[in-house]
């Protein structure tokens, strides 16, 4: 099985729900002992670069927090495991909880993996704070009221924002629309959201082509030829893995982008690989919850970006923010619960304290809703190649809150998108 960020593979394996009795983390822990936090993230494969970016960020965050007293006076000790397929990742999650005795587990990028891991976390009464994983099957929330599981913003936020910015920046400038999107639920739902938003704003456009390459396809010439033959004047693509730079490079060589507007709502995952030499100007370019070059960046973001670029010689993307946000909200929850109870809190007490606590993350302020789904700040805008880097930045920055881009608790996504008050 190939790992994808938004795969929604249904997991019915025998290992998904163990027969072991639920366990409680004992609160009577030596207060000077290190606080062990498990990290599960991909380190290879199609999502490997994303996982590495998140791991680097959480290591930076832990070091910074430890210099300031750690979490409630305890130094943070990270225990890192790799996210791969659902079965193996669930086994590693159990090892972190049962053998390593971590106090919480953070990470997970693939929704296919997180759908399998989340029920295990509930069973084990173990805190799980996801970076980019959800418990959505397509657009349907499968775990509306978890006790211990905290999820990322909804899968579709970046597509909703990119679609709205296509309306804002390109309305009246295109008539023929094509899409090339990954062939699984994330790509198909993003494409449908784009179509519905155009319809809602009364934009009359002909949809002239749809291409559905499998994730990881590195020869996209046939897809590019089909797109070019359709003669679109706007192309929408929610590609975000290593195939996106390949598509842009091969499309440029074929002359696909000449006179064509583009919407790439998740492009920043591949930021460092999207070189100016094959990237046209003016793309609606999605940075999700962290734009590394923001002109009004916080002191926290500036410090992180400087350290990151000095050490790794590349720019960080939104997975860094997701990793920092997870640790920051966990820290806030532990300290709030300890203050309220007067002793080291149980995972249940931390889970009860975390929703609603606003923290400063790398990309701005964020919080978890009562249903334990994140609300953060999203950044996109038209791209420019007029900068000091070898990849595009944003000519102007559009900023939306997640509350403007994702359905409220209990809502149906497709009904919400028809009636919600939109920020454009």
Language-model features, listed with the residues they occupy:
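C-terminal segment of N-terminal export signals and the immediately downstream linker at the start
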Residues: 23-43
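Extracellular/periplasmic periplasmic-binding protein-like sensory domains
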Residues: 251-324, 336-341, 383, 394-423
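Extracytoplasmic "Venus flytrap"
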Residues: 38-57, 81-87, 109-110, 180-189, ...
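Segments of small-molecule ligand-sensing domains
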Residues: 310-320, 331-400, 423-424
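N-terminal export signals
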Residues: 7-28
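Signal peptide-proximal N-terminal region
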Residues: 56-78, 200-205
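Extracytoplasmic ligand/sensor domains, especially the bilobed periplasmic-binding protein
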Residues: 102-210, 261-285
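Beta-alpha junction/loop-to-helix N-cap segments that form part of ligand/metal-binding clefts
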Residues: 49-54, 69-140, 152, 212-220, ...
């Amino acid at each position: 099985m190939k790992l994808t960020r938004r795969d929604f593979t249904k997991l019915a394996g025998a290992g998904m729900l163990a027969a072991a009795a639920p366990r409680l983390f004992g609160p009577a822990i030596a207060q000077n002992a290190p606080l062990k936090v498990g990290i599960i993230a991909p380190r290879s494969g199609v999502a490997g670069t994303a996982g590495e970016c998140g791991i680097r960020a959480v290591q930076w965050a832990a070091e910074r927090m430890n210099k300031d007293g750690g979490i409630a006076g305890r130094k943070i000790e990270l225990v890192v495991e790799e996210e791969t397929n659902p079965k193996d990742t669930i086994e590693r999650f159990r090892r972190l909880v049962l053998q390593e005795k971590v106090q919480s587990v953070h990470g997970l990028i693939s929704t296919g993996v997180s759908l399998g891991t989340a029920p295990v976390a509930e069973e084990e009464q173990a805190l799980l704070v996801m970076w980019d994983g959800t418990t959505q099957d397509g657009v349907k929330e499968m775990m509306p009221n978890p006790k211990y599981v905290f999820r990322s913003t909804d899968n579709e936020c970046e597509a909703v924002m990119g679609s709205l910015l296509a309306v804002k920046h390109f309305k009246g400038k295109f008539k023929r629309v094509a899409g090339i999107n990954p062939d699984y639920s994330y790509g198909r739902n993003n494409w449908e959201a784009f179509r519905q938003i155009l319809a809602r704003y009364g934009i009359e456009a002909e949809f002239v082509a749809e291409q559905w390459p499998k994730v990881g396809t590195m020869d996209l010439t046939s897809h590019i030829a089909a797109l070019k033959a359709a003669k679109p004047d706007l192309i929408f693509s929610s590609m975000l893995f290593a195939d996106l730079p390949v598509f842009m490079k091969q499309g440029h060589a074929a002359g696909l982008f000449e006179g064509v507007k583009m919407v790439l709502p998740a492009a920043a995952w591949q930021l460092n690989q999207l070189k100016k030499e094959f990237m046209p100007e003016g793309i609606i370019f999605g940075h999700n919850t962290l734009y590394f070059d923001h002109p009004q960046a916080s002191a926290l973001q500036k410090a992180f970006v400087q350290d990151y670029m000095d050490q790794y010689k590349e720019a960080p993307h939104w997975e860094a923010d997701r990793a920092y946000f997870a640790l920051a909200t966990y820290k806030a929850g532990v300290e709030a619960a300890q203050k309220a109870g007067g002793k080291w809190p149980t995972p249940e007490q931390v889970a009860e304290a975390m929703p609603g606590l606003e923290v400063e993350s790398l990309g701005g302020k964020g919080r978890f809703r009562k249903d334990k789904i994140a609300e953060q700040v999203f950044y996109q805008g038209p791209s420019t190649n007029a900068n000091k880097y070898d990849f595009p930045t944003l000519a102007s920055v559009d900023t939306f809150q997640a509350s403007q881009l994702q359905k409220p608790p209990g809502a149906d996504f497709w009904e919400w998108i028809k009636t919600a008050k939109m920020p454009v």
